[in-house]
Amino acid sequence: MTGDTDPPKQSRTQYGSISSSPSPGPPQVPPGGTYLSEKIPIPNAEPGTFSLRKLWAFTGPGFLMSIAYLDPGNIQSDLQAGAVAGFKLLWVLLWATVLGLLCQRLAARLGVVTGKDLGEICHLYYPKVPRTLLWLNMELAIVGSDMQEVIGTAIAFNLLSAGRIPLWGGVLITVVDTFFFLYLNNYGLRKLEAFFAFLIAIMAFTFGYEYVVARPAQGALLRGLFLPSCSGCGQPELLQAVGIVGAIIMPHNIYLHSALVKSREVDRTRREDIREANMYFLIESTIALFVSFFINLFVMAVFGQAFYQQTNQAAFNICANSSLHDYAKIFPRNNLTVAVDFYQGGVILGCLFGPAALYIWAVGLLAAGQSSTMTGTYAGQFVMEGFLKLRWSRFARLLLTRSCAILPALLVAVFKELQDLSSLNDLLNVLQSLLLPFAVLPILTFTSMPALMQEFASGRVNKVITSSIMLLVCAINFYFLVSYLPSLPHPAYFGLVALLAVIYLGLTTYLVWTCLIAHGATLLVHSSHQHFLYGLLE
């Protein structure tokens, strides 16, 4: 990779933080702000003691971050994993959430210690070509996530209206709801955080209700959760496992969390305050992901119980003999396994457990789609500002992301079938998994650099764990790329996929190389990359 070889000179302004040389002229900040400029004060407490008041003050960024673990992409991944593998992949969900927590801990620590988010650090350390490719891939991840939110919301509106709102109509409605969130943002950060906590509570109630009425077999569920095995599994189950990892650990969410923690007033000149902030953010993130894990577990268990090895004919018979018999026609009368999606999932729940289950499912799906809208906007804003130093108003950023997401979703909704919309959602989950190294590798790199993180750099044990994460993510994606090539519909696609694969592997190799340098591999140090080992020039 080539690009800028001389890193910009930086100066240390406070404990563990760095700042760029100021640009000439006043900063250009559009009206309406582009950043979480409101700072939440942290109450005083006796040093060395745990304070619930302090935990409450630090509570917010972790729950906003956890929304990415509950977006429609996750719900789709959960229900399909349950339908394809029953309870066999519950352990993948558990350990993917644990790995997600480790990554989010590193993201929060980077933001607290340096006072900068991951995008800003990437801008300072990576040469122009790699950081531009990184930025483009993160924008792709954000647009892909927003497309999933559009798809989930459109299907939710269709279910709630008993089909009166067509899918394309639901897609267009998502344009309107964005203005509501921009309006809500004017009421302050704490109220915004409270609203998203309310949406998480709705999801916990709705999907928890489905879990109670479905009554999954608890013994089989616990075995699937704590015994890592998958007897009789093939490529469909493997692809679902990859989809779970990609849906749970969202690449842009790591960039988002490193920025959200900057909304709390932390005195970065005092190591005690930094250590305390790291502790409280870790506790909050653990609680938030604990909640998100159980919500995902509810969905996967419900569909593992209701859909596993279910045939289309069986689903047709169930609906034909229920009060929702008009929906039976969506299931072909054959003995193939049901290809479950958002829509069919809601219908079969309604046929099995009554119309209330259908509408409660749709409300939960709607909450999942709506809650992810604003966090995706923030992520896009932080990524753009960090990588490009380009500041847009939140309205402009939201309009750009939603426009890019709506157009392909609208075309599929108008000209294709519902199944095509759900297939697009599956593809987007795999895309998130493929893009994951472009968030995981940078965060592992920078949190391992003593020159940047000082005494808060990852220790030997953490480096072993995080390096294992890096190898696992890269191995999963390499296996997927190799497995995917034979399934291409036409040989003409091979050239395009091969070109993209070369770029993908080239960027991944570069990121692994710089990560190894940051971990102390001095033999790999090139003169233009010494700052990954020794830090930026003072």
From Swiss-Prot:
Coiled coil: none annotated. Residues 1-54, 103-139, 186-193, 262-286, 368-394, 454-468, 514-538 are cytoplasmic. One of its GO terms (cellular component) is plasma membrane. It is found in: Late endosome membrane; Lysosome membrane. It is a multi-pass membrane protein. It catalyses: Zn(2+)(in) + H(+)(out) = Zn(2+)(out) + H(+)(in); Fe(2+)(in) + H(+)(out) = Fe(2+)(out) + H(+)(in); Mn(2+)(in) + H(+)(out) = Mn(2+)(out) + H(+)(in). Its main location: membrane. Keywords: Endosome, Glycoprotein, Ion transport, Iron, Iron transport, Lysosome, Membrane, Transmembrane, Transmembrane helix, Transport. The keyword Ribosomal protein does not apply. One of its GO terms (molecular function) is metal cation:proton antiporter activity. Glycans are attached at N321, N335. It holds the Pfam family Nramp. InterPro entries: NRAMP_fam. Residues 1-36 are annotated as: Disordered. The chain crosses the membrane at residues 55-75, 82-102, 140-160, 165-185, 194-214, 241-261, 287-307, 347-367, 395-415, 433-453, 469-489, 493-513. GO terms for biological process: iron ion transmembrane transport; iron ion transport; manganese ion transport; MAPK cascade; response to lipopolysaccharide. Residues 76-81, 161-164, 215-240, 308-346, 416-432, 490-492 are extracellular. NCBIfam families: nramp, Nramp_1. Macrophage-specific antiporter that fluxes metal ions in either direction against a proton gradient. Localized to late endosomal lysosomal membranes, delivers bivalent cations from the cytosol into these acidic compartments where they may directly affect antimicrobial activity. Involved in iron metabolism and host natural resistance to infection with intracellular parasites. Belongs to the NRAMP family. This is Natural resistance-associated macrophage protein 1. It comes from Sus scrofa.
